[in-house]
């Protein structure tokens, strides 16, 4: 029960971060460093020089991870039309917790803005819940 509430809070926080980036006309870019930490930044989607990869420019579909010598190859599972990365559940939960804990550290102004935006989003949902319950009863 506790982990499902934690996942809801994490998803709410990550959704608020993406909403904040979209309001600024940017997308959220997460980069995994070689020491296991996650760096995040907001990048302009029209700036092709800052993209991690582009399949048109990279026909071998090789992705390099910063700090690692070997590159990874993209594969399509079951010959699907859409490429989808499916991490394991425990790894996904670990990464969400890492993103949440690193974003809440008071290091950058963007992190603080995302934290305040997620708190405001949570407060708004709580307020609408209270109003909805008072109307029903």
UniProtKB/Swiss-Prot annotation:
GO CC, any one term: membrane
Protein's cellular compartments: Host membrane
Membrane topology reported for the UniProt record: Single-pass membrane protein
Main location: host cell
Alphabetical UniProt keywords: Host membrane, Membrane, Transmembrane, Transmembrane helix
Transmembrane segments: 116-136
Protein name according to UniProt: Uncharacterized protein ORF20
Lineage, opening ranks: Viruses, Viruses incertae sedis, Halspiviridae, Salterprovirus, Salterprovirus His1
